[in-house]
């Protein structure tokens, strides 16, 4: 049983504030939702279950029941998930405010314990204190959180997450922030709450508290493309494709870590809720993560023998050649930018091979083929530099005055020629390693300039950042006909 979900269900009946704040999709009537994919903890109701993707950030972090409310930890609306979400540097005062919010929403005192006990004992078989019937009382106040890093910003989603030992397929990792607070003070707060419970429940409460307040923080995970909705991958090769996200917004205007203070003034809180609205954003999928995904797919289709060939056709337009014809049916070629990069890269490398090595036909076996296979994987800069260096050395460079040089005296296409003129100022006949690296980078950067890309897509922006971009007409820029530089 999910303790946090049960606590929200029972405490929602206490008063008007709780009824508004503690409303969860997991406790309401189920509605059809998208298919679930991975195992993990729903950030909204904190239960461990099968997760589907959030409509606000497209990351898998919400269960099929809670997905009906489309809540995201990046929203600009004072729902419970947003008020439990803290960002970057967290102070002791911030944690104090969080604990006060917990005490306000989930109080334990003699009156409340007696009230719930009377309701539960109305049935003749419920005289004993069974944990499953009093589960809502067994949620201690801890500083347990799930954290995630999104392009330099670290988000902490506090809650009470059961079954921490289970498999976690999400990009969130368990973080214990008790070191930023006073351990003895937190113990005292929980012991005071526990004192109002019957003895049998006190023991279970204590066990849960110490297990969730003394655990070791996990190593933070790196977010991967598999953590995002599969719908993105299905359409990623369309240059006109945009990501559609839904955000819950309001007239809330507080510092990020102060959202939990809003319930202190109930009238002001309900005024903010009246301004709640849903906003839709169309966002470009342009980011380093998705670019690397597309380039990796293209890399798997590479036919390295083309660099030794005499074909007059571009690398993607060779037909009826056993060694050079690529699979043109792959969806990756729907993106004309990938095709342009592929053609220009291999036109340039072929010119280098023909200028420096004695090769006559694409059927020949050359050592340089191994280095060419991953030449598109520029997102991993260090590995890519090593790869290009190996390729350069296999071209049998001539050493003069501690520098190595190779020749360039074979024909190149107009696109590559323009790159050479723009980067070096002319079409050179002699190149160094740094020249080759520079030219290959420019060919790729002309369409996919990863130097200025975020690692994750803009779906992980806060609402304020999305609004700022919309004012500049930038978030939904289509990619057709323009490069990332433009």
Curated annotation (Swiss-Prot):
Name of protein: Non-structural protein 1
Keyword RNA-binding in record: yes
Subcellular location: Host cytoplasm, Host cytoskeleton
Chain spans, region Interaction with host IRF3: 317-486
Any GO molecular function: metal ion binding
Statement: the UniProt record of this protein carries the keyword Phosphoprotein: yes
Ranges for region RNA-binding: 1-81
InterPro entries for the chain: Rotavirus_NSP1 (IPR002148)
Keywords, alphabetical: Host cytoplasm, Host cytoskeleton, Host-virus interaction, Inhibition of host innate immune response by virus, Inhibition of host IRF3 by virus, Inhibition of host IRF7 by virus, Inhibition of host NF-kappa-B by virus, Inhibition of host RLR pathway by virus, Interferon antiviral system evasion, Metal-binding, Phosphoprotein, RNA-binding, Viral immunoevasion
Family to which this protein belongs: Belongs to the rotavirus NSP1 family.
Placement of sequence motif pLxIS motif: 480-483
Function: Plays a role in the inhibition of host innate immunity by inducing the degradation of key host factors required to activate interferon production such as IRF3, IRF5 or IRF7. Associates with components of cullin RING ligases (CRLs) including CUL1 or CUL3, which are essential multisubunit ubiquitination complexes, to modulate their activities. Recognizes the host NF-kappa-B regulator BTRC through the presence of a DSGXS motif in the C-terminal substrate recognition domain.
Record GO cellular component, one term: host cytoskeleton
């Amino acid at each position: 049983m999910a303790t946090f979900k049960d606590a929200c269900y029972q405490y929602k009946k206490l008063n008007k504030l709780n009824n508004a704040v503690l409303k969860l999709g997991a406790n309401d009537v189920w509605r059809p939702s998208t298919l679930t994919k991975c195992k993990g903890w729903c950030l909204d109701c904190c239960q461990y279950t099968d997760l589907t993707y959030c409509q606000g950030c497209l990351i898998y972090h919400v269960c099929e029941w809670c997905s009906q409310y489309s809540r995201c930890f990046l929203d600009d609306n004072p729902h419970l998930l947003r008020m439990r979400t803290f960002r970057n540097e967290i102070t002791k005062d911030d944690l104090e405010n969080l604990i006060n919010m917990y005490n306000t929403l989930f109080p334990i005192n003699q009156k409340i314990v007696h009230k719930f006990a009377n309701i539960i004992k109305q049935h003749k078989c419920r005289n004993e204190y069974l944990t499953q019937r009093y589960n809502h009382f067994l949620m201690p106040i801890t500083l347990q959180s799930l954290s995630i890093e999104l392009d330099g910003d670290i988000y902490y989603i506090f809650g009470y997450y059961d079954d921490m030992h289970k498999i976690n397929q999400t990009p969130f990792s368990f973080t214990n922030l008790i070191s930023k607070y006073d351990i003895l003070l937190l113990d005292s707060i929980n012991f005071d709450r526990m004192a109002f419970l019957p003895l049998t429940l006190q023991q279970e409460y204590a066990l849960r508290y110490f297990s969730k307040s003394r655990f070791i923080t996990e190593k933070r995970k790196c977010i991967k493309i598999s953590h995002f909705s599969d719908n993105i991958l299905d359409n990623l090769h369309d240059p006109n494709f945009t990501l559609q996200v839904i955000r819950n917004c309001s007239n809330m205007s507080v510092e990020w870590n102060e959202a939990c203070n809003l319930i202190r003034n109930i009238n002001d809180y309900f005024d903010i809720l009246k301004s709640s609205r849903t906003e839709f954003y169309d966002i470009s999928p342009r980011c380093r993560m998705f670019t690397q995904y597309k380039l990796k797919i293209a890399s798997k289709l590479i036919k390295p023998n083309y660099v030794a060939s005499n074909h007059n056709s571009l690398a993607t337009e060779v037909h009826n050649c056993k060694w050079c014809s690529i699979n043109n049916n792959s969806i990756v070629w729907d993106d004309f930018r990938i095709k342009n990069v592929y053609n220009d890269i291999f036109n340039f490398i072929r010119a280098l091979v023909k200028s420096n090595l004695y090769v006559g036909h694409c059927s020949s076996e050359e050592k340089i083929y191994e280095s060419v296979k991953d030449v598109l994987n520029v997102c991993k800069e260090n590995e890519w530099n090593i790869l290009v260096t190996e390729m350069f050395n296999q071209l049998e460079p001539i050493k003069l005055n501690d520098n190595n040089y190779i020749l360039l005296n074979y024909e190149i296409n107009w696109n590559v020629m323009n790159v050479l003129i723009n980067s070096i100022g002319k079409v050179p006949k002699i190149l160094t390693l740094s020249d080759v690296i520079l030219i290959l980078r420019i060919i790729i950067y002309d369409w996919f300039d990863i130097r200025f890309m975020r690692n994750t897509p803009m779906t992980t922006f806060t609402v304020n950042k999305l609004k700022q971009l919309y004012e500049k007409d930038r978030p939904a820029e289509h990619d057709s006909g323009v490069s990332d530089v433009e």
